[in-house]
Amino acid sequence: MVKIAIFASGSGSNFENIVEHVESGKLENIEVTALYTDHQNAFCIDRAKKHDIPVYINEPKQFDSKAAYEQHLVTLLNKDKVEWIILAGYMRLIGPDLLASFEGKILNIHPSLLPKYKGIDAIGQAYHSGDTITGSTVHYVDCGMDTGEIIEQRQCDIRPDDSKEQLEEKVKKLEYELYPSVIAKIVK
């Protein structure tokens, strides 16, 4: 059984999708040890409680430095014998302490066809760009923002009559298929 921790900052829909894949047996030999969140009021906490997943709430402002924050996370991760970190809407850059402890063992999903539209509001950037396709990317995490080695991408059309909300739904649907598929192939 491979132990993973999932990091999320917001609603946690990708977190819950992964948990449901584990619970249903579609993601085999994986144990979700805990949800790690950096916001005490994030909706992902409710999703974790619904699935009886332990939650660690650690807000960086509670620590003297980013290094102290990440060292605390590493202590918790090591206590739970976590082997992989899965970022699912975690809105912070991973720093050197976490990267050193989990080198090559941190995955992220991003709602664009990287290297296009890194950072926040990638779907909005694609929508307003005039592009005719966008998609989702799973990549390894490095010290940059959405710059790690790309593992796999899936794409969808941006139709002229799509609203931004419709495009967000299309990309979310891709993410719900892509992330568990990549996790099944990579996390062993």
Swiss-Prot record:
Residues binding N(1)-(5-phospho-beta-D-ribosyl)glycinamide: 12-14
Q: List the Gene Ontology MF annotations in alphabetical order.
A: phosphoribosylglycinamide formyltransferase activity
Q: In which pathway does it act?
A: Purine metabolism; IMP biosynthesis via de novo pathway; N(2)-formyl-N(1)-(5-phospho-D-ribosyl)glycinamide from N(1)-(5-phospho-D-ribosyl)glycinamide (10-formyl THF route): step 1/1
Q: Which reaction does it catalyse?
A: N(1)-(5-phospho-beta-D-ribosyl)glycinamide + (6R)-10-formyltetrahydrofolate = N(2)-formyl-N(1)-(5-phospho-beta-D-ribosyl)glycinamide + (6S)-5,6,7,8-tetrahydrofolate + H(+)
The catalytic site is made up of: 110 (proton donor)
Q: Does the keyword Acetylation apply?
A: no
Q: What is its EC number?
A: 2.1.2.2
GO cellular component terms, semicolon-separated: cytosol
Q: Which keywords accompany this UniProt record?
A: Purine biosynthesis, Transferase
This protein is called what?
Phosphoribosylglycinamide formyltransferase
- Superkingdom of origin: Bacteria
A GO BP annotation = 'de novo' IMP biosynthetic process
Q: Binding residues for (6R)-10-formyltetrahydrofolate, per the UniProt record?
A: 66, 91-94, 108
Q: Does the keyword Transferase apply?
A: yes
Give the function comment from the record.
Catalyzes the transfer of a formyl group from 10-formyltetrahydrofolate to 5-phospho-ribosyl-glycinamide (GAR), producing 5-phospho-ribosyl-N-formylglycinamide (FGAR) and tetrahydrofolate.
- Give the site residues for Raises pKa of active site His: 146
What family is this? Answer: Belongs to the GART family.
Task: Identify the InterPro entries for this entry.
Answer: Formyl_transf_N (IPR002376), Formyl_transf_N_sf (IPR036477), GART (IPR004607)
